[in-house]
Amino acid sequence: MADPRTFLGALFDLSGKHILLTGASSGLGRHFARTLARAGARVAMAARSVEKMAALAQEIRAEGGLCDVYALDVRDREAIRACVAAAEAVAPLDALVNNAGIARPRAPEKLSDEAWDEVYETNLRGPWVLAQEVVKRRLADGRECSIVNIASILGIRAIGHLAPYSAAKAGLINLGRDLCVDLAERGIRVNALAPGYFITEMNDEWLASPAGDRLRQRVPAKRFGKPEELDGALVFLCSDASRFMNGNCITVDGGHTAGV
């Protein structure tokens, strides 16, 4: 019998794949960039903070990984088009990971139109414009591709004070379903990955607070996730292992959405 490690390695191998990742400068995006590069992909890292990504790129390249850095504000349509065009000039994109996102928690009565628009444009309209730009190119050349929308369990359930965030993440999940119906037969798959609560440098202090501890008690696993515990699902969705999976949402949350 063949070595199972060889079989699994080939199944999930991202070597030769070109993947555009947004929100790559911090939080889960920073971790995702390393993960995809370690799995063999050439990662087109896009975010507003070029300096942070430049430092990350040095680390990835020091490990033998392949990556490029692109300045991108996902609220800017023209910047999106320019970013996708620049990445495509390097090589056709095999996958898009829509990871950029913001929260802006507010009580409903205190939520301004500007805050709502900022969250919506970052978390839903930006991913849509990015997906559309990539889809146009893949339909033109007939290549298959995978679009992975990083959603949230807050697109499935709610905790309050996050109306635009929850609405946008729910929209992101259903955007994938609708695009699947239109694009599946043409070799384009669109799925969502909905993390629960994961510890990053962006939220570690809050998750360690009394309020964070109360939230932890609601997770059946009785702990928060570690970024590396998203690696399997992310690589799966970007790889050929998920070629017949489309319009779905994978939750990785320690059982959070299964609880009351």
Indicate residue ranges for each PLM-predicted region.
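Active-site helix of classical SDR
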Residues: 131, 168, 176
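Conserved glycine-rich cofactor-binding loop
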Residues: 18, 25-26
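Alpha-helical segment proximal to the catalytic Tyr-Lys
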Residues: 136, 181-185, 243
